[in-house]
Swiss-Prot record:
It comes from Bacillus cereus (strain ATCC 14579 / DSM 31 / CCUG 7414 / JCM 2152 / NBRC 15305 / NCIMB 9373 / NCTC 2599 / NRRL B-3711). CDD domains: PAL-HAL. Its EC number is 4.3.1.3. It is found in: Cytoplasm. It is an enzyme of class 4 (lyase). One of its GO terms (molecular function) is histidine ammonia-lyase activity. Pfam families: Lyase_aromatic. Contains an active site 4-methylidene-imidazol-5-one (MIO), which is formed autocatalytically by cyclization and dehydration of residues Ala-Ser-Gly. This is Histidine ammonia-lyase. It comes from the Bacteria.
Length: 506
């Protein structure tokens, strides 16, 4: 099934299908007509010799240098080559695929001035699964993602490298095998390709997709811990959460009640104790607040996915060609920094639940869930590992968006650092997943001491799925492998909505 790009309607759900399920794209004919009409304006500007930034002038600090008509093509090619200054490891292939999709989508708004040929070439790369190799480092997030997008533009010209059929090859290898000809950029097209926020946004979309799945999984894993610690179910009563009024908090409490509705391991207020520690009792409040962050981030991503972030932009049939600053990544920089904090908190509270599972002073379980306390250490060092990841997240959660370093001889004197924020958000999510994996391993072990038959229908199903990934702890072993196995499984599971056999959970 193909997803139609219009420049206005792309959603996160569609991006999920495009990035993770490999669906193809096509362009809306009406939007393509707008692209063609806008291109005519650019060609007339060049023909008439008008002075317009980025079309007949240099770039950045060189904006006052007039470019002769015969040099317009060379200007675009020089721009791409000189700006391809990315460094470091490449973005995940899903991100570079997302960059192609988002760049095509923004051009389909019909205000960038490129030829339809350029849009079609981007779509060909998506549909043939030719994905640019794009280094992760080197973007200031204004003027957009210049370096990363230059590496994307290179491959359209038959230069640079691509991921193709599971290999990293020169772009011309893939183009030749697919029977495609590299394109030669004309006026404005180089700038239109690289002036935008598509690297930070593509990475942000992938991060959001993973974060959403992780947040659902965190609720299910926390529910297993509640059982392992014989938590008090009253704290999740609907009346408590409606009294505060946050929808996300109410929803988390509702899902946990559904997950645990037939559990024989939860307790009532006063049965074993009057109240639980915050890491159990306040799960809806804390996880719910993280869902508030996720909802905010999704809203901003969907705006940016359909935004014209080029410069200059062309309006009213060419009557207005305006230099603006839509390439500035501040909205996504803030959103990604917010995502970092919201997701890091899920690991913070998870690590505290891990401590309650392994600390014999806080429960009546075997110390560190060890099969032979003293002779065998059990889950002792797993808690250390979780604490390390949580601490690392606190460093990564420092806002990238509060920094700015002037560039281009102070012409570009304020930048967003949004791509750094996006990259760090993705790193944090990987760490969160591993912390949750440790909690799950400990919660499964605690469930065995409590009696698996007493678990809820939902958590029991999840327990058995988890045990297919890692065995019960009967002896000390290399737990690093267990943690990674659960983490990989959770990532592949997408979300508990899709993974569980029992629909009662959600």
């Amino acid at each position: 099934m193909m997803i139609t790009l219009t420049g206005h309607t792309l959603t996160v759900e569609e991006m999920k299908r495009l990035l993770l399920e490999g669906e193809g794209v096509t362009a809306c004919p009406t939007s393509m007509q707008k692209v063609a009409e806008c291109r005519e304006v650019v060609e007339k500007i060049v023909e008439d010799g008008k002075v317009v930034y980025g079309i007949t002038t240099g770039f950045g600090k060189f904006s006052d240098v007039l470019i002769q008509k015969d040099d317009v093509k060379a200007l675009q090619h020089n721009l791409i080559q000189s700006h391809a200054c990315g460094i470091g490891d490449p973005f995940p292939e899903e991100v570079s695929r997302g960059m192609l999709i988002l760049r095509a989508n923004t051009m389909l708004k019909g205000v960038s001035g490129v030829r339809p040929l350029v849009v079609n070439m981007l779509l060909e790369f998506v549909n043939r699964k030719i994905h640019p190799v794009v280094p992760q480092q080197g973007s200031l997030g204004a003027s957009g993602d210049l370096a990363p997008l230059s590496h994307l533009a290179l491959v359209l010209l038959g230069e640079g490298e691509v991921f193709y059929k599971g290999k990293r090859v020169h772009a011309m290898v893939a183009l030749t095998e697919e029977g495609l000809e590299p394109i030669e950029l004309e006026a404005k097209e180089g700038l239109a390709l690289i002036n935008g926020t598509q690297a930070m946004t593509a990475q942000g979309v992938l991060s959001y997709i993973e974060a959403e799945a992780t947040a659902y999984q965190a609720e299910l894993i926390a529910s297993m811990t509640i059982e392992g610690l014989q938590g008090i179910i009253d704290a999740f009563d609907e009346n408590v959460h409606k009294a505060r009024g946050y929808k996300e908090q109410v929803d988390v409490a509702s899902r946990i009640r559904d997950i645990l509705h037939d559990s024989k391991l939860t307790t009532k207020q006063g049965e074993l104790r009057v109240q639980d520690a915050y890491s159990l009792r306040c799960i809806p409040q804390v996880h719910g607040a993280s869902w508030q962050v996720l909802n905010y981030v999704k809203e901003k991503l969907e705006i940016e996915m359909n935004a014209a972030t080029d410069n200059p932009l062309i309006f009213d049939g060419g009557e207005k060609v305006i230099s603006g600053g839509n390439f500035h990544g501040q909205p996504i920089a803030f959103a990604m920094d917010f995502l970092k904090v919201g997701m890091a908190e899920l690991a913070n509270i998870s690590e505290r639940r891990i401590e309650r599972l392994v600390n014999p002073q806080l429960n009546d379980l075997p110390p560190f869930l060890s099969p032979e306390p003293g002779l065998q250490s059990g889950a002792m060092i797993m808690q250390y590992a979780a604490a390390s990841l949580v601490s690392e997240n606190k460093t990564l959660a420092h806002p990238a968006s509060v920094d700015s370093i002037p560039s281009s001889a102070n012409q570009e004197d304020h930048v967003s650092m949004g791509t750094i924020a996006s990259r760090h958000a993705h790193q944090i999510i990987q760490n969160v997943r591993r912390v949750l994996s440790i909690e799950m391993i400990c919660a499964m072990q605690a469930a065995e001491y409590r009696g698996i038959e007493n678990m809820s229908t939902v958590t029991k199903s999840f327990y058995h799925q988890g045990r297919q990934q890692v065995p019960s702890i009967t002896n000390d072993r290399i737990f690093s492998t267990d943690i990674e196995n659960i983490a990989h499984w959770l990532k592949a599971s997408d979300s508990i909505k899709e993974r569980l056999d029992v629909n009662a959970a959600l």
